[in-house]
Amino acid sequence: VKNQALKERLAEASLRQYFISKAPIIIVACGFPDNCYSRMGNYMKSWAVDVACAVEHLMLQAEEEGLGTCWIGAFEEMEVKALLNIPENVKVLALTPLGYPDEEPRYRPRKELEEIVSYDKY
């Protein structure tokens, strides 16, 4: 989405996360639940996994190119769909603004590997 008025309305539909409207574009990541592999152990839909992987790869490559992104998962899906005329059979999984950052993010210390990884059992 490049249109400024639409970006501002998407920011409003994203629980008033207005910073996203400042990016040159907002990517709206969608999937087709009816056209996906339906057997993933009945605990997860493959369309969501597929779209999430695609968005994450996009975000990693954007970082490599010096671009900034931010996964936006908090939004009113029906409002987003109405704004963009997204068909009923299509689900919106995430939004991400994309552009060159205005500032460097502040450093946040990372957890030690032992704090987040388990071996052999939880």
For each of these PLM feature ranges, what is it?
Residues 82-88, 105-108:
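Short proline/glycine-enriched turn/loop segments at secondary-structure junctions
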Residues 30, 73, 98-99:
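Conserved residues at the C-terminal ends of beta-strands
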Residues 1-54:
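Glycine/small-residue-rich phosphate/adenosyl-binding loop
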Residues 94-122:
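C-terminal helix-cap and adjacent tail motif
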